[in-house]
From Swiss-Prot:
This protein's name: Gene 57 protein
Name of the gene this protein is made from: 57
Residues of the Toprim domain: 57-137
CDD domains reported for this sequence: TOPRIM_primases
Matching SMART domains: TOPRIM
InterPro entries: TOPRIM_DnaG/twinkle (IPR034154), TOPRIM_dom (IPR006171)
Gene3D superfamilies: 3.40.1360.10
Domain of life: Viruses
Length: 152
């Protein structure tokens, strides 16, 4: 079932075990559908919560694990959600201490809807839209790291 998929681990901190895998999502890389697979019964979680443990004045939020990884590789502390409808009100408290929470919105209607739904719950939110038809990963892949950082 998961053969030919990229395994994306969701990590969790435990004082007894340190960082451990809490869940795994799978990204199909063979072009099949559905594009993403989750283990049955999985809960909505933030991806890359390690970013929340490092000192930073700003934090970014992405829709999608691959966009989150790309933003992190560009030097932006970033957490991600597995989809546009996955923001939960209880996530809010984790982001209130930052100067800015940059919501890196995909360049489509769903991306802007995601960004607005998150932004309305955070007083320190800034929506950073990607160009039409682009997401963080495609922007950096086609135009380089500077293209993303200039938008911030």
């Amino acid at each position: 079932m998961y053969r030919g998929c990229l395994a994306i681990p969701y990590m969790r901190w435990s004082p007894w075990r340190h960082w451990t895998v809490a869940a795994i999502r799978y990204r199909r890389i063979d072009g099949g559908t559905p594009k993403y697979l989750s283990m049955p019964g999985e809960k909505d979680r933030l991806y890359n919560t390690y970013a929340l443990t490092k000192y930073s004045k700003d934090m970014a939020i992405c829709e999608g694990e691959l966009d989150t990884i790309t933003a992190e590789l560009c030097g932006l502390p970033t957490v991600g959600l597995s989809g546009a409808q996955k923001w939960k009100p209880y996530f809010r408290e984790l982001f209130l201490g930052y100067r800015n929470v940059n919501i890196l919105a995909d360049g489509d209607d769903a991306g802007m809807e995601f960004a607005r739904s998150v932004a309305k719950t955070l007083p320190n939110a800034r929506i950073i839209p990607m160009p039409e038809g682009e997401d963080v990963n495609s922007l950096v892949t086609s135009q380089g790291k500077a293209a993303l950082l200039e938008r911030i």
